[in-house]
Amino acid sequence: MLPYIALILVCWSVLSQAAQTDVEGRADKRRPIWIMGHMVNAIAQIDEFVNLGANSIETDVSFDDNANPEYTYHGVPCDCGRSCLKWENFNDFLKGLRSATTPGNAKYQAKLILVVFDLKTGSLYDNQANEAGKKLAKNLLKHYWNNGNNGGRAYIVLSIPDLNHYPLIKGFKDQLTQDGHPELMDKVGHDFSGNDAIGDVGNAYKKAGISGHVWQSDGITNCLLRGLDRVKQAIANRDSGNGFINKVYYWTVDKRATTRDALDAGVDGVMTNYPDVITDVLNESAYKNKFRVASYEDNPWETFKK
């Protein structure tokens, strides 16, 4: 009898702890923060940045003349203090990323929950944007989502530098639908990264037929200074109750003082070359009760309510 009683007590203890953890998680009113490792273009860098504290990464995607995604490559110039020349073939990178974001894989990194693809569409003509979106979708479907069969679980943000390239979004969506996987759009968000006027960005989304799943970026290379005026405009839109923005991130944030300024402004994400710096600031007494590192249970398309 005693072993059975002991077993019951152990089970009750485990269930009680789980329930308490669940209640505490739902009661946590801190803003979740996405720490975005900047310019992660080689497979080996995925582990490097996640191990430094990143829960998301940004990867550059270059295109060939026929609008095929070709390399994960930035090139010169890039941020001060970084190597600009690391690269992989795009599909090889997707396979490595899939390994890092698929539960059960030997290379799985549970903390890696979101990927921003910085789409270098500046090499394309405006009339190639739709085709670029279609080809991007086909590559992601095959090499990252594994044709819908236990592929990578990370959320994906398609970051486009040119408002005129909004047809890329429709091409991407149409291709997934044509290939029988429209449900994967639930894992896809959007960003226009050209620091355009917020109103102009909103108009581009209207043309693209997009409402929701919107991250708004603002920033500049770490070699230069940039104020937070436009960040605050984006945050005002996000918090207005009738804006089109769900989340705001700031780049490139490498210094503690800049991190504090961005958090004080109310951003949801910071893109950085030094994730450990952001982690250190989040653990400071002034911030640890207001912010926390986002987990997979945090919806990246949901506007945070205080």
From Swiss-Prot:
InterPro entries reported for this sequence: PLC-like_Pdiesterase_TIM-brl
Keyword annotations from UniProtKB, A to Z: Cytolysis, Dermonecrotic toxin, Disulfide bond, Glycoprotein, Hemolysis, Lipid degradation, Lipid metabolism, Lyase, Magnesium, Metal-binding, Secreted, Signal, Toxin, Zymogen
Signal peptide: 1-18
Top-tier EC class: lyase
Subcellular location: Secreted
Pfam families per record: GDPD_2 (PF13653)
Propeptide: 19-26
Keyword Metal-binding carried by entry: yes
UniProt-listed SUPFAM superfamilies: PLC-like phosphodiesterases
Assigned EC number: 4.6.1.-
UniProt name for this protein: Dermonecrotic toxin LiSicTox-alphaIA2bi
Taxon lineage: Eukaryota, Metazoa, Ecdysozoa, Arthropoda, Chelicerata
